[in-house]
Amino acid sequence: MIGCCLVMASLAVTNMPPPYYGVYAQAVGAPLEKQIEFLSMPLRENVRGNSTYVNTRRYLLGPDNPNFLMTPDGSGLGQGGRIDASALEVQARTTENAAEAARCRALAAWLGKPGASSRRTDTLSPRAALHARAVEAIAAARTMPHPRVFATAADFAALKTRAEKDALLKAGVDRAIVAADDWLGKPTATYGLDGYRLLGVARQGMRRIVLAAFAYRMTGARKYATDALAEMKALCAFPDWNPRHTIDQGELALAVATGYDWTYDALSAADRETIAASLEKHALRADIPFAGWTRLQNNWVQVVAAGLTATTVALADRDRELCANHLAAIAECLPEAESVCGPDGVYTEGPGYWNYGMSFNVICLDVMKKAFGHDFGLSDVKGFKETGLYPALMTGPSGSWFNYSDSHGSTGSSSAVWWYARRLAMTEAVTEGEVAAFKEICAGKAKEIPRTLPFILFWVGEDLTRRTGTLPREWIGQGEMPIAVVSSDRSDRNAPYLAIKGGSPSYNHGHADAGSFVLDMHGLRWAFDLGAENYGKVEAAIGGSGLWSPEPDSKRWSVFRLGTQGHNTLMIGGKGQDPRGFATLTRDGDAVVADLTSVYPQARKVSRRVSVGRLDAQVVDTIEAAPGTEVRWAMNTDATIEWERKPLLHPNMYLFLSKRFSRIGVSDATGGGVWSEGSAQPENDWEQPNPGMRQLIYTAKVPESGRLVLTVTFSTWNAIKFPSGYLRREEPSR
């Protein structure tokens, strides 16, 4: 991510004498080639939250470093620094990051032939060219009247007209106005941290401001502008927007910038100045330019990008250079977060964080296109378009997500899927569950009104509920967190659906869950991922470094929901998975095979093969390890486990899982082991309970041959339970 950090270095100059110790001393005293290597190291190769690492990068990119590459305005080499272009060529050849390689080659070409020394030139560097384009964009935004953040007055007028003819849209608009009414007269926000987060306050502030500002634009009633102003002034009076937790700043920046812009004509000159000055202080001139988000590839980048982009558009007529610097930074950093979805669209942090990060991402792009006429090519980044179908692929017939990593099982409504359907004509992205969830919001039945609802309304429409495409029966998404889905028929709600996870536990928000799966049959979820933990409670119990460290000895892996023991995968030799490993997924005919060997160093080879038929699903594990090694197979379920066998009726079934009026059979695991029922509850009271959950467990030992094969088949054949008995169905076929 060298290019990303170079951008941020050009935003400001700080005097930071280097503390010569540890990684800092090693980096600043190293040859230039090593400095470049250090700057381009991805986050996962360093300790997350390491302030020494962050400060080192700041110094290497700052004017105190003789190799400082860019001047603050991005126009060329600064401080008389010299850099060997051959070092950039080496970095371009060795890095696995295609975007980084392209930047290195471009800069090397600008410097001259490989091996030549640095030279000054009037030719713009790639970074300076991007900065020049940002200056032009801000200049264009300055000419636009308010409102200009995300939508103009003409856009609001068009939305009113469209709502008159679109029942779904009208229901959404009406609900947004009712929600704005509910906020009237309530106390405004107060500063208060939850642990080290201000996020709860930020989100409620965004919800109130954006709903009120939207209601003002749609009705013209000044009571809504007055309410938005009261909340904005309360937030602007905060001592800070909590730069320690950067997404707090990002959400607050988007909220206040949108509210300021959409209610601009109702604000007094004094109120305009108060809000604009606070936005400049808390967003544009705060710690954001040097915060750790610039070196990340996750939802933080997307949230901060949306907030800062909205702020630069809202304040374009104040400080053009300051706004352009931020805009150029976003245009270079955001592709790093988008590209993680490549090549096939998988979001590494799971569908819950996709919903969060991508919603802010697409808001950011629409803000850019409305104000500048383009989005700096951000919508063309490889993986960005492909990820539009990701939530639909992760949604089983039960309506629940494959909620790996820190995701919750409930899908709810997603802003971004409506954007993909509207902007990129991906109507298959809008599932029946998404439409139902949006209608629940409109009917006032949802637990909470989405704070992004006013933005969604510019995309939603009845025309998008008529899906024109179909989802694939089998799909493998490769990349940094491989995911696969196998189903016999995505159009049949009763058909088996199985999704499995590969990748590494060490990724941001990752769990030790390689090989873990979820299973839907009869339109119900039978095998569950327990989902996310409560960050605040866990941090209070084991510390932030304990929760967020990905190291093998981290306390993170002892938390039930995060460690191997709480997932639908294997424990081998009494041990969980090594977070330094990486599980791959490959296709084998209609099946998918997960190579789990690198996450289980206690075994020679481990693989899991999953497949589905029309009426059944199968999981086959092959473990090669020392004879006598114990293997524990586990699956979280909320079903009742029925141990009574009826060999004549069900010759291939060893036990049954039942709930409601449904029942599925489970075969013996063919490994010479023992089935049992275990607890799915954590040992500590500071961990989230898992009500109604239990674990179906199979324990076996590796035989003398050193090779254990466990085959578990789930079947709906002759196993559906009705009050009057069993309904016999046709034989399964593969």
Tell me what each language-model feature is:
Residues 13-70, 74-88, 94-166:
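Mature N-terminal, pre-catalytic/accessory segment of carbohydrate-active enzymes
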Residues 31, 490-553, 559-564, 684-685, ...:
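Terminal accessory carbohydrate-recognition/targeting modules of carbohydrate-active enzymes
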Residues 120-178, 184-193, 217, 240, ...:
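Acidic/polar, glycine-enriched structural segments that form the non-catalytic walls/loops
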Residues 315, 353-526, 586-595, 698, ...:
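Carbohydrate-active enzyme catalytic cores, enriched for enzymes
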Residues 344-347, 456, 652-655:
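Aromatic-residue-lined binding/catalytic grooves and analogous aromatic/hydrophobic interfacial grooves
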Residues 439-442, 537-734:
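CBM-like, beta-strand-rich accessory domains located in the C-terminal region of large
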